[in-house]
Amino acid sequence: MESPAWDATKNDSLPPTLTPAVPPYVKLGLTTVYTIFYLLLFAFVYVQLWLVLHYKHKRFSYQTVFLFLCLLWASLRAVLFSFYFRNFVEANRLGAFTFWLLYCFPVCLQFFTLTLMNLYFARVIYKAKSKYLPELIKYRLPLYLAFLVISLLFLVVNLTCAILVKTDYAETKVIVSIRVAINDTLFVLCAVSLSVCLYKISKMSLAGVYLESKGSSVCQVTCIGVTVILLYTSRACYNLVVLSLSDSRYSSFDYDWYNVSDQADLKCKLGDAGYVVFGIILFIWELFPTSLVVYFFRVRNSAQDMTNPGMVPGFNPRSYFFDNPRRYDSDDDLAWNITPQSLQGSFGPDYFDWGNRNSFGSQTGSLQRDST
Protein backbone atom coordinates (compact mmCIF):
# COMPACT_ATOMS: atom_id res chain seq x y z
CA MET A 1 0.00 0.00 0.00
CA GLU A 2 3.04 2.29 0.21
CA SER A 3 3.84 4.60 -2.69
CA PRO A 4 7.05 3.62 -4.52
CA ALA A 5 10.07 5.86 -4.12
CA TRP A 6 10.66 8.49 -6.79
CA ASP A 7 13.44 7.76 -9.24
CA ALA A 8 14.21 10.79 -11.41
CA THR A 9 16.36 8.69 -13.77
CA LYS A 10 13.38 6.56 -14.85
CA ASN A 11 10.78 9.23 -15.48
CA ASP A 12 11.06 12.74 -16.85
CA SER A 13 7.70 13.86 -15.54
CA LEU A 14 7.26 15.91 -12.41
CA PRO A 15 7.87 14.12 -9.09
CA PRO A 16 4.96 13.49 -6.75
CA THR A 17 3.94 16.44 -4.61
CA LEU A 18 2.87 14.16 -1.75
CA THR A 19 4.68 11.92 0.65
CA PRO A 20 2.99 8.97 2.39
CA ALA A 21 0.90 10.56 5.12
CA VAL A 22 -2.01 8.17 5.62
CA PRO A 23 -1.66 5.05 7.80
CA PRO A 24 -1.94 1.79 5.83
CA TYR A 25 -4.95 0.61 7.84
CA VAL A 26 -6.86 3.78 6.89
CA LYS A 27 -6.20 3.21 3.20
CA LEU A 28 -7.13 -0.45 3.52
CA GLY A 29 -10.36 0.43 5.29
CA LEU A 30 -11.30 3.05 2.72
CA THR A 31 -10.49 0.68 -0.12
CA THR A 32 -12.76 -1.91 1.45
CA VAL A 33 -15.59 0.61 1.85
CA TYR A 34 -15.25 1.88 -1.72
CA THR A 35 -15.21 -1.62 -3.15
CA ILE A 36 -18.22 -2.75 -1.09
CA PHE A 37 -20.29 0.23 -2.22
CA TYR A 38 -19.56 -0.44 -5.88
CA LEU A 39 -20.23 -4.16 -5.48
CA LEU A 40 -23.55 -3.46 -3.76
CA LEU A 41 -24.58 -1.19 -6.61
CA PHE A 42 -23.49 -3.86 -9.09
CA ALA A 43 -25.57 -6.51 -7.31
CA PHE A 44 -28.63 -4.24 -7.12
CA VAL A 45 -28.50 -3.39 -10.83
CA TYR A 46 -27.93 -7.05 -11.69
CA VAL A 47 -31.09 -7.97 -9.79
CA GLN A 48 -33.00 -5.23 -11.60
CA LEU A 49 -32.02 -6.65 -14.98
CA TRP A 50 -33.24 -10.08 -13.89
CA LEU A 51 -36.53 -8.50 -12.80
CA VAL A 52 -36.94 -7.14 -16.32
CA LEU A 53 -37.06 -10.74 -17.52
CA HIS A 54 -39.18 -11.89 -14.58
CA TYR A 55 -41.89 -9.27 -15.10
CA LYS A 56 -41.60 -9.62 -18.88
CA HIS A 57 -40.82 -5.98 -19.56
CA LYS A 58 -39.33 -4.94 -22.86
CA ARG A 59 -35.74 -6.15 -23.09
CA PHE A 60 -34.57 -3.20 -25.17
CA SER A 61 -35.76 0.05 -23.64
CA TYR A 62 -34.52 3.19 -21.95
CA GLN A 63 -34.74 1.36 -18.65
CA THR A 64 -32.63 -1.64 -19.64
CA VAL A 65 -30.01 0.50 -21.42
CA PHE A 66 -29.64 2.71 -18.35
CA LEU A 67 -29.34 -0.29 -16.05
CA PHE A 68 -26.80 -2.02 -18.29
CA LEU A 69 -24.61 1.11 -18.46
CA CYS A 70 -24.74 1.44 -14.67
CA LEU A 71 -23.92 -2.27 -14.27
CA LEU A 72 -20.84 -1.90 -16.47
CA TRP A 73 -19.81 1.28 -14.67
CA ALA A 74 -20.07 -0.29 -11.21
CA SER A 75 -18.10 -3.36 -12.29
CA LEU A 76 -15.22 -1.26 -13.70
CA ARG A 77 -15.01 0.89 -10.58
CA ALA A 78 -15.05 -2.20 -8.35
CA VAL A 79 -12.21 -3.73 -10.36
CA LEU A 80 -10.20 -0.49 -10.14
CA PHE A 81 -10.43 -0.27 -6.37
CA SER A 82 -9.75 -3.97 -5.96
CA PHE A 83 -6.26 -3.25 -7.33
CA TYR A 84 -5.50 -1.18 -4.25
CA PHE A 85 -5.69 -4.14 -1.88
CA ARG A 86 -2.42 -5.68 -3.04
CA ASN A 87 -1.51 -4.18 -6.40
CA PHE A 88 -1.16 -0.49 -5.61
CA VAL A 89 1.84 -0.10 -7.91
CA GLU A 90 0.18 -1.91 -10.83
CA ALA A 91 -2.86 0.36 -10.55
CA ASN A 92 -0.62 3.34 -11.33
CA ARG A 93 1.41 1.61 -14.08
CA LEU A 94 -1.33 0.30 -16.32
CA GLY A 95 -1.05 -0.03 -20.07
CA ALA A 96 -2.78 2.44 -22.35
CA PHE A 97 -5.94 0.42 -23.00
CA THR A 98 -6.28 -0.87 -19.43
CA PHE A 99 -5.74 2.65 -18.12
CA TRP A 100 -8.47 3.94 -20.41
CA LEU A 101 -10.83 1.09 -19.50
CA LEU A 102 -10.52 1.49 -15.73
CA TYR A 103 -9.98 5.23 -15.35
CA CYS A 104 -11.51 6.88 -18.44
CA PHE A 105 -14.29 4.64 -19.74
CA PRO A 106 -16.41 4.91 -16.54
CA VAL A 107 -16.54 8.68 -17.11
CA CYS A 108 -17.72 7.99 -20.67
CA LEU A 109 -20.46 5.72 -19.31
CA GLN A 110 -21.66 8.48 -17.01
CA PHE A 111 -21.82 10.87 -19.93
CA PHE A 112 -23.82 8.30 -21.90
CA THR A 113 -26.36 8.09 -19.06
CA LEU A 114 -26.65 11.89 -19.07
CA THR A 115 -27.37 11.95 -22.80
CA LEU A 116 -29.92 9.16 -22.40
CA MET A 117 -31.67 11.13 -19.66
CA ASN A 118 -31.94 14.01 -22.12
CA LEU A 119 -33.48 11.73 -24.72
CA TYR A 120 -35.89 10.14 -22.25
CA PHE A 121 -37.25 13.43 -20.90
CA ALA A 122 -37.38 14.88 -24.40
CA ARG A 123 -39.55 11.89 -25.30
CA VAL A 124 -41.85 12.66 -22.36
CA ILE A 125 -42.29 16.19 -23.73
CA TYR A 126 -42.93 14.81 -27.19
CA LYS A 127 -45.58 12.46 -25.84
CA ALA A 128 -47.37 15.34 -24.13
CA LYS A 129 -47.27 17.65 -27.15
CA SER A 130 -47.67 15.23 -30.04
CA LYS A 131 -51.48 15.60 -29.87
CA TYR A 132 -51.54 19.17 -31.14
CA LEU A 133 -48.03 19.31 -32.64
CA PRO A 134 -47.76 16.08 -34.68
CA GLU A 135 -44.95 17.58 -36.75
CA LEU A 136 -42.64 17.10 -33.76
CA ILE A 137 -42.10 13.52 -34.89
CA LYS A 138 -39.77 14.71 -37.65
CA TYR A 139 -37.35 16.07 -35.04
CA ARG A 140 -36.93 12.77 -33.21
CA LEU A 141 -34.39 11.23 -35.58
CA PRO A 142 -32.19 14.39 -35.77
CA LEU A 143 -32.28 14.56 -31.97
CA TYR A 144 -31.16 10.95 -31.63
CA LEU A 145 -28.40 11.46 -34.19
CA ALA A 146 -27.18 14.64 -32.49
CA PHE A 147 -26.77 12.94 -29.11
CA LEU A 148 -25.19 9.91 -30.79
CA VAL A 149 -22.57 12.14 -32.44
CA ILE A 150 -21.91 13.94 -29.16
CA SER A 151 -21.45 10.62 -27.33
CA LEU A 152 -19.08 9.30 -29.99
CA LEU A 153 -17.08 12.54 -29.83
CA PHE A 154 -16.78 12.17 -26.06
CA LEU A 155 -15.67 8.55 -26.42
CA VAL A 156 -13.11 9.23 -29.16
CA VAL A 157 -11.57 12.19 -27.30
CA ASN A 158 -11.14 10.15 -24.11
CA LEU A 159 -9.73 7.12 -25.90
CA THR A 160 -7.29 9.17 -27.97
CA CYS A 161 -6.06 11.19 -25.00
CA ALA A 162 -5.64 8.07 -22.86
CA ILE A 163 -3.45 6.48 -25.54
CA LEU A 164 -1.41 9.62 -26.18
CA VAL A 165 -0.80 10.35 -22.52
CA LYS A 166 0.87 6.94 -22.13
CA THR A 167 3.45 7.64 -24.83
CA ASP A 168 6.91 8.77 -23.73
CA TYR A 169 7.05 11.81 -26.00
CA ALA A 170 3.57 13.13 -25.21
CA GLU A 171 2.92 16.62 -23.85
CA THR A 172 0.83 15.35 -20.96
CA LYS A 173 -0.28 18.76 -19.70
CA VAL A 174 -1.54 19.80 -23.15
CA ILE A 175 -3.33 16.49 -23.78
CA VAL A 176 -5.06 16.52 -20.41
CA SER A 177 -6.06 20.16 -20.87
CA ILE A 178 -7.69 19.41 -24.22
CA ARG A 179 -9.53 16.40 -22.83
CA VAL A 180 -10.81 18.25 -19.79
CA ALA A 181 -11.93 21.25 -21.85
CA ILE A 182 -13.89 19.12 -24.33
CA ASN A 183 -15.32 16.64 -21.83
CA ASP A 184 -16.54 19.12 -19.26
CA THR A 185 -17.90 21.52 -21.85
CA LEU A 186 -20.04 18.67 -23.19
CA PHE A 187 -21.10 17.79 -19.64
CA VAL A 188 -22.23 21.37 -19.02
CA LEU A 189 -24.11 21.57 -22.33
CA CYS A 190 -25.96 18.30 -21.65
CA ALA A 191 -26.76 19.44 -18.12
CA VAL A 192 -28.22 22.69 -19.47
CA SER A 193 -30.26 20.72 -22.01
CA LEU A 194 -31.58 18.44 -19.28
CA SER A 195 -32.54 21.41 -17.11
CA VAL A 196 -34.55 22.85 -20.00
CA CYS A 197 -36.39 19.53 -20.39
CA LEU A 198 -37.18 19.40 -16.68
CA TYR A 199 -38.46 22.98 -16.75
CA LYS A 200 -40.82 22.19 -19.62
CA ILE A 201 -42.05 19.02 -17.90
CA SER A 202 -42.78 20.94 -14.69
CA LYS A 203 -45.00 23.31 -16.69
CA MET A 204 -47.00 20.54 -18.38
CA SER A 205 -49.50 18.79 -16.13
CA LEU A 206 -50.18 16.26 -18.88
CA ALA A 207 -46.55 15.16 -18.72
CA GLY A 208 -47.02 14.76 -14.98
CA VAL A 209 -49.98 12.46 -15.55
CA TYR A 210 -47.86 10.36 -17.89
CA LEU A 211 -45.08 10.07 -15.32
CA GLU A 212 -47.59 9.14 -12.62
CA SER A 213 -48.97 6.41 -14.85
CA LYS A 214 -45.44 4.99 -14.91
CA GLY A 215 -45.08 4.99 -11.13
CA SER A 216 -43.17 8.26 -10.91
CA SER A 217 -44.07 11.93 -10.45
CA VAL A 218 -42.96 15.37 -11.57
CA CYS A 219 -41.64 16.08 -8.07
CA GLN A 220 -39.52 12.93 -8.03
CA VAL A 221 -38.22 13.53 -11.55
CA THR A 222 -37.38 17.14 -10.74
CA CYS A 223 -35.55 16.30 -7.51
CA ILE A 224 -33.47 13.54 -9.08
CA GLY A 225 -32.82 15.54 -12.25
CA VAL A 226 -31.79 18.71 -10.43
CA THR A 227 -29.47 16.78 -8.11
CA VAL A 228 -27.77 15.03 -11.02
CA ILE A 229 -27.46 18.33 -12.89
CA LEU A 230 -25.91 20.12 -9.91
CA LEU A 231 -23.43 17.32 -9.22
CA TYR A 232 -22.28 16.92 -12.81
CA THR A 233 -22.15 20.68 -13.42
CA SER A 234 -20.19 21.36 -10.23
CA ARG A 235 -17.72 18.64 -11.16
CA ALA A 236 -17.29 20.05 -14.67
CA CYS A 237 -16.92 23.62 -13.40
CA TYR A 238 -14.35 22.52 -10.84
CA ASN A 239 -12.32 20.79 -13.53
CA LEU A 240 -12.49 23.82 -15.81
CA VAL A 241 -11.43 26.14 -12.97
CA VAL A 242 -8.46 23.93 -12.12
CA LEU A 243 -7.61 23.85 -15.82
CA SER A 244 -7.35 27.63 -15.88
CA LEU A 245 -4.94 27.77 -12.93
CA SER A 246 -1.19 27.92 -13.32
CA ASP A 247 1.15 25.11 -12.28
CA SER A 248 1.97 26.80 -9.00
CA ARG A 249 -1.67 27.25 -8.13
CA TYR A 250 -2.96 23.74 -8.73
CA SER A 251 0.09 22.21 -7.04
CA SER A 252 -1.09 23.93 -3.86
CA PHE A 253 -4.20 21.73 -3.88
CA ASP A 254 -1.90 18.98 -2.50
CA TYR A 255 -3.32 16.44 -4.95
CA ASP A 256 -0.91 14.20 -6.80
CA TRP A 257 -2.73 14.52 -10.11
CA TYR A 258 -4.15 17.32 -12.18
CA ASN A 259 -7.81 16.56 -12.73
CA VAL A 260 -8.59 15.19 -9.29
CA SER A 261 -12.26 14.63 -9.95
CA ASP A 262 -11.80 12.74 -13.19
CA GLN A 263 -8.64 10.81 -14.06
CA ALA A 264 -5.17 10.53 -12.58
CA ASP A 265 -3.21 11.18 -15.75
CA LEU A 266 -1.13 14.36 -15.42
CA LYS A 267 1.49 13.37 -12.88
CA CYS A 268 3.21 10.08 -12.35
CA LYS A 269 1.40 8.45 -9.42
CA LEU A 270 -1.33 8.91 -6.86
CA GLY A 271 -0.04 9.78 -3.43
CA ASP A 272 -1.50 8.39 -0.23
CA ALA A 273 -3.58 11.43 0.67
CA GLY A 274 -4.42 11.88 -2.99
CA TYR A 275 -5.84 8.37 -3.12
CA VAL A 276 -8.12 9.13 -0.18
CA VAL A 277 -9.41 12.31 -1.78
CA PHE A 278 -9.79 10.55 -5.12
CA GLY A 279 -12.07 7.93 -3.57
CA ILE A 280 -14.16 10.46 -1.66
CA ILE A 281 -14.68 12.61 -4.75
CA LEU A 282 -15.66 9.59 -6.84
CA PHE A 283 -18.17 8.70 -4.15
CA ILE A 284 -19.78 12.17 -4.18
CA TRP A 285 -19.57 12.99 -7.89
CA GLU A 286 -20.03 9.49 -9.34
CA LEU A 287 -21.56 6.92 -7.01
CA PHE A 288 -24.28 9.18 -5.60
CA PRO A 289 -25.69 10.49 -8.93
CA THR A 290 -25.45 7.05 -10.52
CA SER A 291 -27.37 5.55 -7.60
CA LEU A 292 -30.10 8.16 -8.10
CA VAL A 293 -30.41 7.23 -11.77
CA VAL A 294 -30.60 3.54 -10.87
CA TYR A 295 -33.32 4.29 -8.32
CA PHE A 296 -35.38 6.20 -10.88
CA PHE A 297 -35.11 3.45 -13.50
CA ARG A 298 -35.59 0.58 -11.07
CA VAL A 299 -37.94 -2.20 -12.17
CA ARG A 300 -41.51 -2.06 -10.95
CA ASN A 301 -44.13 -4.77 -11.05
CA SER A 302 -46.66 -4.07 -13.78
CA ALA A 303 -49.48 -5.35 -11.58
CA GLN A 304 -48.53 -2.88 -8.87
CA ASP A 305 -48.41 -0.03 -11.38
CA MET A 306 -51.99 -0.83 -12.38
CA THR A 307 -53.06 -0.30 -8.76
CA ASN A 308 -50.96 2.83 -8.17
CA PRO A 309 -52.61 4.85 -5.38
CA GLY A 310 -52.28 7.95 -7.54
CA MET A 311 -54.69 6.47 -10.07
CA VAL A 312 -58.40 7.15 -10.03
CA PRO A 313 -60.18 4.02 -8.69
CA GLY A 314 -61.83 2.03 -11.43
CA PHE A 315 -59.62 3.30 -14.24
CA ASN A 316 -56.62 1.70 -15.83
CA PRO A 317 -53.52 3.85 -16.61
CA ARG A 318 -54.70 4.57 -20.14
CA SER A 319 -58.17 5.78 -19.16
CA TYR A 320 -56.70 7.63 -16.20
CA PHE A 321 -54.38 9.47 -18.52
CA PHE A 322 -57.10 10.65 -20.89
CA ASP A 323 -59.82 11.23 -18.26
CA ASN A 324 -57.70 12.93 -15.60
CA PRO A 325 -59.25 16.35 -14.81
CA ARG A 326 -55.82 17.89 -14.23
CA ARG A 327 -55.05 17.75 -17.94
CA TYR A 328 -56.64 21.20 -18.29
CA ASP A 329 -54.50 22.83 -15.62
CA SER A 330 -52.16 24.60 -18.08
CA ASP A 331 -52.25 26.26 -21.47
CA ASP A 332 -50.32 23.36 -22.96
CA ASP A 333 -53.03 20.95 -21.88
CA LEU A 334 -55.87 23.18 -23.09
CA ALA A 335 -54.45 22.85 -26.58
CA TRP A 336 -55.33 19.14 -26.51
CA ASN A 337 -58.92 20.12 -27.37
CA ILE A 338 -57.89 21.83 -30.61
CA THR A 339 -57.33 18.90 -32.96
CA PRO A 340 -58.50 15.62 -31.42
CA GLN A 341 -57.95 13.70 -34.67
CA SER A 342 -54.37 14.80 -35.26
CA LEU A 343 -52.52 12.81 -32.63
CA GLN A 344 -49.89 10.61 -34.21
CA GLY A 345 -48.48 9.02 -31.05
CA SER A 346 -49.75 8.07 -27.65
CA PHE A 347 -48.57 6.82 -24.32
CA GLY A 348 -48.13 3.10 -24.64
CA PRO A 349 -48.53 0.75 -21.70
CA ASP A 350 -44.98 -0.58 -21.97
CA TYR A 351 -42.70 0.69 -19.26
CA PHE A 352 -39.86 2.98 -20.39
CA ASP A 353 -40.15 1.74 -23.98
CA TRP A 354 -38.61 3.40 -27.02
CA GLY A 355 -42.07 4.42 -28.26
CA ASN A 356 -45.48 3.21 -29.30
CA ARG A 357 -47.35 4.52 -32.31
CA ASN A 358 -50.98 3.75 -31.48
CA SER A 359 -53.28 6.43 -32.79
CA PHE A 360 -55.29 8.69 -30.56
CA GLY A 361 -58.41 7.94 -32.54
CA SER A 362 -58.34 4.24 -31.71
CA GLN A 363 -57.86 4.99 -28.03
CA THR A 364 -60.63 7.58 -27.79
CA GLY A 365 -62.89 5.20 -29.70
CA SER A 366 -62.25 2.47 -27.17
CA LEU A 367 -62.91 4.90 -24.33
CA GLN A 368 -66.22 5.94 -25.88
CA ARG A 369 -67.26 2.31 -26.23
CA ASP A 370 -66.36 1.73 -22.59
CA SER A 371 -68.45 4.73 -21.51
CA THR A 372 -71.48 3.43 -23.41
Swiss-Prot record:
Whose protein is this, by species? Xenopus laevis (African clawed frog)
Which gene is the coding source of this polypeptide chain? gpr137b
Identification of the protein by name: Integral membrane protein GPR137B
Q: Where in the cell is it found?
A: Lysosome membrane
The function of this protein is: Lysosomal integral membrane protein that regulates the localization and activity of mTORC1, a signaling complex promoting cell growth in response to growth factors, energy levels, and amino acids. Interacts with Rag GTPases and increases the lysosomial localization and activity of Rag GTPases and thereby regulates mTORC1 translocation and activity in lysosome. Involved in the regulation of lysosomal morphology and autophagy. Also acts as a negative regulator of osteoclast activity.
| Disulfide cysteine pairs (residue numbers) | none
Instruction: Please list every transmembrane segment annotated in the UniProt record, as residue ranges.
Output: 33-53, 65-85, 94-114, 145-165, 174-194, 223-243, 277-297
Which residues are reported to be glycosylated? N11, N259
Q: Which residues lie on this side of the membrane: Cytoplasmic?
A: 54-64, 115-144, 195-222, 298-372
Stored InterPro entries = GPR137
Q: Name one cellular component (GO) term.
A: lysosomal membrane
Does the UniProt entry include the keyword Repressor? no
